[in-house]
Curated annotation (Swiss-Prot):
Annotated organism of origin: Picosynechococcus sp. (strain ATCC 27264 / PCC 7002 / PR-6)
GO terms for cellular component: cytoplasm
Entry-linked InterPro entries: RsmH, SAM-dep_MeTrfase_MraW_recog, SAM-dependent_MTases_sf
Keyword field contains Transport: no
E.C. no: 2.1.1.199
Top enzyme category: transferase
Lineage summary: Bacteria, Bacillati, Cyanobacteriota, Cyanophyceae, Oscillatoriophycideae
Family, as annotated: Belongs to the methyltransferase superfamily. RsmH family.
Entry's Gene Ontology molecular function annotations: rRNA (cytosine-N4-)-methyltransferase activity
Main subcellular location: cytoplasm
SUPFAM superfamilies in the record: Putative methyltransferase TM0872, insert domain, S-adenosyl-L-methionine-dependent methyltransferases
Name of this protein: Ribosomal RNA small subunit methyltransferase H
Gene: rsmH
Annotated residues for binding of S-adenosyl-L-methionine: G35, G36, H37, D54, F81, D97, Q104
NCBIfam families: 16S rRNA (cytosine(1402)-N(4))-methyltransferase RsmH (TIGR00006)
Amino acid sequence: MAAEFKHISVLKEELVAGLGVKPEGHYLDVTLGGGGHTELILQQYPDVRVTGVDRDSQAIAAASERLKSFGDRFRAVRSNFGEYQPQGEKFDGIIADLGVSSVQFDQGDRGFSFRFDAPLDMRMDQQQTLTAADIVNTYEEKALANLFYEYGDERLSRQIAKKIVMKRPIQTTKELEEIVFYTYHPKARKVKIHPATRVFQALRIAVNGELDALQYLLVNAPQWLKPQGRLGIISFHSLEDRLVKNAFRQRDIWRILTKKPMVASETEINQNPRARSAKLRFAELKETTE
């Protein structure tokens, strides 16, 4: 399985540079994935250590294999970062690359993408019980509509929810994709972004508790960081970016290092289209709270 997990990290150079890595520092990567960001830190700074956290067992296996040459400078922890608790240690910096990995999108049987006909799953942690099919088939119509609107900014949320309830049970990605697609007017179907994208995003966020995990990180990161430690977060949609921006602004313990988010270059976007929506924000923990 490890060989199959080849995630392409976005804004890799910018994220590592923005950390301001300190000699003999200890860093926390709460979204380890395939290990791309962690690998760059370990390569560029030979006296630092990184602890990597991921809820996906395939990611942990792949990253551990990829980074084994770094020995005890790297440690992997299988955990949802929304539940992670450091064992009394403090870090010089924390990084998070939010959302689903390119590998998870490309593994058709995991149900993250409507490009493949697969069970409606969408679990990052395959040991959890809640799936996208559970939500689609058990939520009341109003709850589904609210979910699609709030987590996906879906303007046809009510119409889509009504059709879903009429056609239940729905078990596969293609079934759901077709319902959403044909809810749209024929002219609105011929757009760059597929009509089902927002509904699939909303379901993925709900299944994996992504916003709750981010809130947990934003609340707890100050306790995990040493003074002048930095927190760098890459987000992929407006809900995430808004949470990060507001958390940095509303708590006086942070010194904001990016007044506007950093974005990918055209070169990177051409090489990795996923980078187009990525936004990177940094803040530094003040030495003392005022």
